[in-house]
């Protein structure tokens, strides 16, 4: 797999041109463009595993991917968009499990989750039930990889089954504006794929909100990626999340980073709106006085579909809106309504996914 590194600047310029054109109707300021590293920028990767027999009858294992156009599989020895740690682990893992029936039989996929801090989680997916024998072999594999210098976690997954030998997460450390922020990242949960671009996004969000007054509300905060970084800029932060594992990670991250003004609530945006408006009462809110919060800034990072109409109406009521988008077209659609009441103070492109058409962007909106 060869990357068109020599074309990176042109590809990024094309993304910036297209995003600028989408934002023109809303009279934005000049677009801030944040470029990625040109290789080894991705912190996670997933590969199917192909089983074959060589010319002398030995079983062989390969990482494979599928061509998006032809659907043909191709062998992956090295993966230049993934960080160096993943590439090193790819070859070491296959070398260590080759010929091991317990670890290779019905193994169909391997997922890698790595960090800038040097930790890596390897999730091995099987079409079979995993037993104590598998667990013993996996523990021996972990020990051999650790002997090679890897800080590794091994997780086995099968239908309705998950075995983590030690733990099912890695701990990332991100240097943000001169401070190291600690984030627990659970395997098979969402994390920002381009860690160094994530740092740029966090620093940009912090710079937008630096002189804020009042409190911040974040919808669907995940493991607290943004809310932890932004907490310093606000009196209090209230964040919602529906995933139980993400809430647990967020609570851990809050404690590890010494944040004392951030409250995570496990509920949906719709439920939170009902609670704020006094429509319903929730046991999950016992001990939390919503009236004590003065949330005049809201942070949203919606899925590709953008904000639904009800959430859009709710967001529009806030004085300041920080909107991170993974789909510029739905961002532009949402801005048709938001621009009636708010102006774009700042706009940015974050090249989270080089060499693809995917665009990550951010707008900082202030009420007119």
UniProtKB/Swiss-Prot annotation:
Enzyme Commission no: 2.1.1.-, 2.1.1.35
Pfam families per UniProt: tRNA_U5-meth_tr
A molecular function GO annotation: tRNA (uracil(54)-C5)-methyltransferase activity, S-adenosyl methionine-dependent
Gene3D superfamilies: 2.40.50.1070, Vaccinia Virus protein VP39
GO biological process: tRNA methylation
Stored SUPFAM superfamilies: S-adenosyl-L-methionine-dependent methyltransferases
NCBIfam families: trmA_only (TIGR02143)
Official protein name in the record: tRNA/tmRNA (uracil-C(5))-methyltransferase
Organism field: Actinobacillus pleuropneumoniae serotype 7 (strain AP76)
């Amino acid at each position: 797999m060869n990357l068109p590194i020599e074309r990176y600047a042109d590809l990024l310029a094309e993304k910036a041109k297209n995003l600028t054109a989408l934002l023109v109707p809303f009279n934005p300021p000049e677009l801030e463009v944040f470029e990625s590293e040109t290789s080894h920028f991705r912190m996670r990767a997933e590969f199917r595993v192909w089983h074959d027999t060589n010319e002398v009858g030995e079983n062989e294992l390969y990482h494979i991917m599928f061509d998006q156009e032809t659907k043909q599989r191709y062998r992956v020895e090295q993966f230049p968009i993934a960080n160096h740690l993943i590439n090193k682990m790819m070859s070491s893992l296959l070398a260590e499990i080759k010929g091991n029936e317990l670890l290779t039989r019905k193994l169909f996929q391997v997922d890698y989750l790595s960090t800038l801090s040097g930790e890596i989680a390897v999730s091995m997916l099987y079409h079979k039930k995993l037993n104590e024998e598998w667990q013993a072999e996996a523990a021996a594999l972990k020990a051999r990889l650790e002997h090679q210098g890897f800080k590794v976690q091994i997780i086995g997954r099968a239908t309705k089954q998950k075995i983590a030998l030690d733990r099912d997460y890695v701990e990332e450390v991100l240097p943000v504006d001169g401070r190291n922020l600690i984030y627990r990242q659970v395997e098979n949960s969402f994390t920002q794929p381009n860690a160094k671009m994530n740092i740029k996004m966090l620093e940009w969000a912090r710079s937008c909100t630096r002189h804020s007054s009042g409190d911040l509300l974040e919808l669907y905060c995940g493991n607290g990626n943004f809310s932890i970084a932004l907490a310093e800029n606000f009196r209090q932060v209230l964040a919602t999340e529906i995933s139980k594992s993400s809430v647990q990670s967020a609570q851990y991250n809050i404690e590890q980073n010494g944040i004392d003004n951030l409250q995570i609530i496990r509920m949906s945006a719709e439920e939170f709106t009902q609670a704020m408006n006094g429509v319903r009462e929730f046991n999950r809110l016992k001990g939390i006085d919503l009236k004590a919060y003065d949330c005049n800034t809201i942070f949203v990072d919606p899925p590709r579909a953008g904000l639904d109409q009800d959430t859009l109406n709710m967001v529009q009521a806030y004085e300041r809106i920080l909107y991170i988008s993974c789909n510029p077209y739905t961002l532009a659609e949402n801005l048709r309504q938001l621009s009636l009441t708010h102006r774009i103070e700042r706009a940015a492109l974050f090249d989270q996914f080089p060499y693809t058409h995917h665009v990550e962007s951010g707008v900082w909106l202030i009420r007119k």
